Amino acid sequence: MPNFDAHTPMMKQYLTIKAENPDILLFYRMGDFYEMFYDDAKKAAALLDISLTKRGQSAGRPIPMAGVPYHAVEGYLAKLVQLGESVAICEQIGDPAASKGPVERKIVRIVTPGTVSDENLLPERQDNLLVAVYQEKDRFGLASLDMSSGRFQIAEAENAETLHAELQRLQPAELLYSEDFSEMAIIEQTKGLRRRPIWEFELGTAVQLLNRQFGTKDLKAFGVEKAVLGLCAAGCLFQYAKETQRTALPHIKSISLVQNSDTVQLDAATRRNLELTRNLSGGTENTLASVLDKCVTPMGSRLLKRWIHQPIRKIQKLRQRQQTIAAILQDDLIDELQPLLRQVGDMERILARVALRTARPRDLTRLRTALEQLPQLQQIIKTLQNLTALSQPMGEFAELCDLLQRAIIDSPPLLIRDGGVIAPGYHAELDEWRSLADGATQYLADLERRERESTGIDTLKIGYNAVHGYYIQISQGQAHNAPMHYVRRQTLKNAERYIIPELKTYEDKVLKAKGAALALEKQLYEEIFDQLLPHLAALQLSSMTLAELDVLTNLAERAETLNYVCPEFSPEIGVEIQNGRHPVVEQVLKEPFIANPVCLNPQRRLLVITGPNMGGKSTYMRQTALITLMAYMGGFVPAERAVIGPIDRIFTRIGASDDLASGRSTFMVEMTEMANILHQATADSLVLIDEIGRGTSTYDGLSLAWACAEWLAKKLRSLTLFATHYFELTVLPEQFAGTANVHLDALEHDNTIAFMHAVQDGAASKSYGLAVAALAGVPQQVIKLAKQKLAQLEKLSAQSADQKLQDLRTLHQMQGELALMEEDDGKNAALEMLEKLDPDELSPKQALAYLYQLKTLL
């Protein structure tokens, strides 16, 4: 501990408390302000755009100081949290009047980006997650906690790519990682990074902490006991949550394991390329969520986004969702359910604040309003067979609703410290104290009248302020007429203020009554928490059910408004879509969207898609993935009909840009994403590949594109949409069974081009690249020059086209002869020999000898 003897007592206290939390900002309460000193002051001044001043000297040096008013602190905290900062709140807990030295202070809570629960500090319609990651060799454990709902989950990742995908799904507000974590490239761009000591990830400690929290002997009931790496991460996360909240966390009642086998897996590139909740620019406009999310409650909106990012594979559960949506549509219940659900509000987060005992008076009135909707909602859902499963978990809570109706006034003040929250008639003693305090108005009016009459001073009036209490005010012109027993309390420019014994006695009596009323009111407010907490688990289950009902009602409204249909699930591998539409693009276009079919099945697994730039290839592929994903959410889809078979993963390799932060070129990004697909995809995967091989030479790119397509078609047998400008690949259907050509066409006339956007069988005839360049505004002289060059190149190309195709076919035959794609039982001897050879070190004679030797091995 540093020596603080050279400092004043107050600064000693500050520095001692600051030493306990050196890495975060300390808001140190002094009267009506939270003050910051030294480096904290400099940092806060820069981040919050507040004045940096100085406070005297300590240890012979000026002390940098910055401060914010206590009554406006939430706005400043919100800004700091958004910037990824954490703040320790240090309050005065001692009585200034009874303190000989500095008033006793202590840290009452630590506000961090991942543990906030105050509604002013939280993004309303997205989850705010605290996440911890733990690494053991090449495997990873993850834990996530939503402090504002109590949802606590763990998962395990078999490799760095899966970890990246999970972090992309979770989008943590704050991320804890161990000191020995080695994959920093994955997490270094995350806000709110917190490095934690290795011992916090110890398994035994984690299990002990979690059992104590849940009141269990072991974790078998939660199905997580074998997820060791996930539990290690959970232990660190839970310790951090306890450390920052400094109170019990009764709303965290369970922990669950996220199983990859239960969900359709989406890697990080797929989540980004499909623009599920964020567009490619990082905004929320023109995303799938922006189209689908018309939920009337914030908690419903958050749940819908979880469904979007984590589509499920349990067909029974999916059909239940579909049936509920269909029932809501059939009985025309949208207009009945949504007004009631809108009144429910954000019950989930209110309950978290109740659990933490930080709920404000208006939280309790909103909870009361939510509970008041339950009888009507129950009446509606009990009449429909497909909705009755929601009835029991929703509950009614008539007693709690009655408690809140009796206890809290209709429009309470913002904070309990303002008083006037508890309703009249709820508590007799409180009513008595209030009556005494409120009687001051009539008494003061009578006293003012008497004093005017007795003194003859017509400007005399009685007033009150927080500094001087009650006073008698007389104008300066008549102050000389004040009686002798008037004791001067304050002199103003135009008036004098006095006190008399009778008024002082009454002031003491009123202030005592107000103080007693406020103290009793705070006590009663805490007792309301005591009565709510035993029902917390049931209330949380109710809020989850209401959020689900909101999502399903919302999806019904979207299906009706946007003309969606219910997809069918088939046990047969494939994706068949009749007149499918892109759910986002069709909302943005001013002209009608051109719907297109998709047919993928065991006999037609890979479609080679050709056509012009801007012709709609990328849109066609994305809409196929989005329709599939929407089906596995349990919602309806934009098509005339959709039959979806088993899908375990969705991969996309669409578009790319340089990853400057990691020092990777466009081509390197493409190849990294492609490598992930080739390693991870299965026969049940849906794969979208767009323009692979563009970032290198023509022959390199063509070779890579051919090899990737062949691997997908023959080895992986994934359901694949493969868009390309390499027309040489249109011969693939001649080479491999299960492969077909489709194209999108355009019409060119008088230097203009019209894109048809309709998918047709067969290969495209040309790419229309020059017409697109002209549309983009490339100067006509350049276009003219390009056309001349194109004519020359096409003439040369025509002469060698047959030879090029023959070369590709020959290459394919050679690959077959070399058994390049034989079963994974090891490489043959010829390939092993080739791998060991260094051509640069061979003489011509040695090379010829090796060639003969290789010939004998084939």
From Swiss-Prot:
InterPro entries: DNA_mismatch_repair_MutS, DNA_mismatch_repair_MutS-lik_N, DNA_mismatch_repair_MutS/MSH, DNA_mismatch_repair_MutS_C, DNA_mismatch_repair_MutS_clamp, DNA_mismatch_repair_MutS_core, DNA_mismatch_repair_MutS_N, DNA_mismatch_repair_MutS_sf
Single GO biological process annotation from the record: mismatch repair
DNA damage among keywords: yes
Record has Endoplasmic reticulum as a keyword: no
Disulfide feature: none
Keywords of this entry: ATP-binding, DNA damage, DNA repair, DNA-binding, Nucleotide-binding
Function: This protein is involved in the repair of mismatches in DNA. It is possible that it carries out the mismatch recognition step. This protein has a weak ATPase activity.
PANTHER family according to UniProt: DNA MISMATCH REPAIR PROTEIN MSH1, MITOCHONDRIAL (PTHR11361:SF34), DNA MISMATCH REPAIR PROTEIN MUTS FAMILY MEMBER (PTHR11361)
Name of the protein in its database record: DNA mismatch repair protein MutS
Species this protein is from: Actinobacillus succinogenes (strain ATCC 55618 / DSM 22257 / CCUG 43843 / 130Z)
